[in-house]
């Protein structure tokens, strides 16, 4: 029988410098109890290559979380600046332990408590319109730092994962002429292990794209959405640098433009796929997902309007 007692505090601070400038910070705690299977001291032999045994001495894990944000707005200029940061730390984190059985391909998995888990996240965004809000510039960025711990053959392994991303965006809005958005971003994902024999990993991703609408003769619209992704550092069998293009033509007619005929072409280069990287325990998983490919769609939209008299 185990008995636990936790005091879970929380705090909030808000300060308004003015109607256009504010700062707030929060702290809270929470705990997670080990589940039945993690506590059960009976071996699960359903998979002889991975025998799982619980640990009845596990303690609950406790998470401390802090976040803060700052926002400043200039209503006259339409300018916005936002800053955000967060920090999470876990005490007595419940982690898996894996021990290889000598001269076999089998392993024994169990659970233990350990400290050293934390993650830090920060992001910012700056937006500024020009020329009576016809042109808008936006710059944003974000970064993560995650520190994870596993045990392999009773040896502690620390996986330090760092991710950061920068993005630039330009928007053009000319009424009844064009709405256009151009964006580009660069991100990097780096994982470093403390245990020898595990290779460090570094991947990079560069993305750029353009999307918008052009308006002709008050009833004809041409829309487009193009993006290109360039990946490096992934496993060679996963490397894919898709260029994705979508086009549509839209014609509005009838009184008050109540009817719209639209033709869409999706993924015209037939390259739609995605690559992601997940880091957990002593494993790095690269995933490639092939999504719905090139296709076309013709649609008719009729808008019913009820004008009260």
Predicted regions and their residues:
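Exposed, low-structure sequence patches enriched in small/polar residues
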Residues: 1-309
């Amino acid at each position: 029988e185990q008995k636990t007692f936790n005091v879970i505090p929380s705090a909030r601070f808000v300060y308004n410098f003015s109607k256009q400038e504010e700062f707030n910070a929060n702290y809270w705690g929470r705990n997670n109890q080990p589940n039945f299977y993690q506590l059960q001291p009976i071996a699960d032999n359903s998979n002889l290559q991975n025998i799982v045994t619980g640990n009845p001495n596990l303690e609950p894990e406790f998470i401390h979380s802090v976040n803060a944000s700052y926002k400043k707005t200039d209503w006259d200029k339409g300018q916005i600046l936002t800053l955000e940061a967060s920090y999470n730390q876990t005490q007595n984190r419940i982690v898996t332990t894996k021990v290889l059985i000598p001269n076999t391909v089998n392993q024994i998995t169990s659970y233990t408590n350990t400290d050293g888990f934390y993650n830090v996240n920060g992001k910012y965004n700056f937006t500024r319109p020009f020329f009576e809000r016809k042109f808008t510039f936006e710059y944003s960025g974000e970064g993560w730092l995650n520190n994870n711990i596993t045990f392999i053959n009773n040896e502690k392994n620390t996986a330090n994962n760092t991710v950061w991303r920068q993005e630039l965006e330009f928007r053009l809005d000319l009424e009844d002429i064009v709405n256009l958005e151009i964006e580009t971003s660069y991100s990097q994902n780096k994982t470093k292990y403390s245990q020898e024999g595990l290779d460090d990993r570094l991947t990079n991703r560069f993305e750029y794209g353009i999307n918008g609408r052009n308006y002709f003769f008050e009833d004809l619209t041409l829309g487009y959405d193009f993006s290109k992704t360039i990946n490096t550092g992934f496993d060679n069998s996963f490397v894919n640098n898709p260029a994705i293009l979508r086009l549509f033509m839209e014609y509005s007619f009838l009184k008050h433009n109540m009817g719209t005929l639209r033709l869409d072409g999706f993924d015209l280069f037939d390259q739609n796929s995605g690559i992601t990287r997940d880091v957990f325990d002593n494993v790095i998983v690269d995933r490639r997902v092939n999504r719905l490919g090139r296709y076309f769609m013709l649609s008719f939209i009729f808008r019913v309007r009820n004008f009260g008299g």
